[in-house]
């Protein structure tokens, strides 16, 4: 069972009751606090599109505390972040691993942050296949293409050479917030607003 806090806001027309995520959305804040899957991707994409329609010139702030998840779902979020007119500022709180780190690095240049004790982890995509040998071969070729595409995007977002990214994502590669800044996944470590 998921517990969602509610906040009460005083307005000129009385009190208004919001779930916390709706209230944050009002301030152009999106919180990704779980695994990246089709459901969370649909919610984040919808919020990005909504906030762009509200004001295409104001930044959106995407807070990330995620262990990662599905590549296709993460790419749906990433592509939407690049597609909309608003700058999307990304802030890692806690953990941004795998697709969470990919989304963190995909924020607007100069607006990618992590809190001091956050942890960031990059690695190659994983998957599995079953069936006939031909089907397994097709799946293996597809995941290698996906790995190449993800590494190309990370290289572009970090300024690192493709070969460096490819080597550094062969295994789980954990970084502190400061190490992630030095690597180019984020622009700076922040301690306060």
From Swiss-Prot:
Pfam families: CLP_protease
Reactions that this protein is recorded to catalyse: Hydrolysis of proteins to small peptides in the presence of ATP and magnesium. alpha-casein is the usual test substrate. In the absence of ATP, only oligopeptides shorter than five residues are hydrolyzed (such as succinyl-Leu-Tyr-|-NHMec, and Leu-Tyr-Leu-|-Tyr-Trp, in which cleavage of the -Tyr-|-Leu- and -Tyr-|-Trp bonds also occurs)
Transmembrane helix keyword on record: no
GO annotation, biological process: protein quality control for misfolded or incompletely synthesized proteins
A GO CC term assigned to this protein in UniProt: cytoplasm
Family annotation (PROSITE patterns): CLP_PROTEASE_HIS (PS00382), CLP_PROTEASE_SER (PS00381)
The keyword Transcription regulation is annotated on this UniProt entry: no
Active site: 98 (nucleophile), 123
Protein name: ATP-dependent Clp protease proteolytic subunit
Gene name in the database record: clpP
């Amino acid at each position: 069972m998921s517990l969602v806090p509610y906040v009460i806001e005083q307005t000129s027309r009385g009190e208004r009751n919001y779930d916390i995520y709706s209230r944050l959305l009002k301030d152009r804040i999106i919180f990704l606090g779980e695994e990246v899957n089709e459901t969370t991707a649909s919610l984040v994409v919808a919020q990005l599109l909504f906030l762009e329609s509200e004001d295409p010139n104001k930044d959106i702030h995407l807070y990330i505390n995620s262990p990662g998840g599905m590549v296709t779902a993460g790419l749906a979020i990433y592509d939407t972040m690049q597609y909309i007119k608003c700058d999307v500022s990304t802030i890692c709180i806690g953990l941004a691993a795998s697709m969470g780190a990919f989304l963190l690095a995909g924020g607007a240049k100069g607006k990618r942050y992590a809190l001091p004790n956050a942890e960031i982890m990059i690695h190659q995509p994983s998957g599995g296949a079953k069936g006939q040998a031909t089907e397994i071969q097709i799946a293996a070729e597809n995941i290698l293409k996906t790995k190449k595409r993800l590494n190309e995007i990370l290289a572009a977002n970090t300024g690192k050479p493709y070969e460096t990214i490819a080597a550094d994502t062969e295994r789980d590669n954990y970084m502190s917030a400061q190490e992630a800044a030095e690597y180019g996944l984020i622009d700076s470590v922040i301690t306060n607003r």
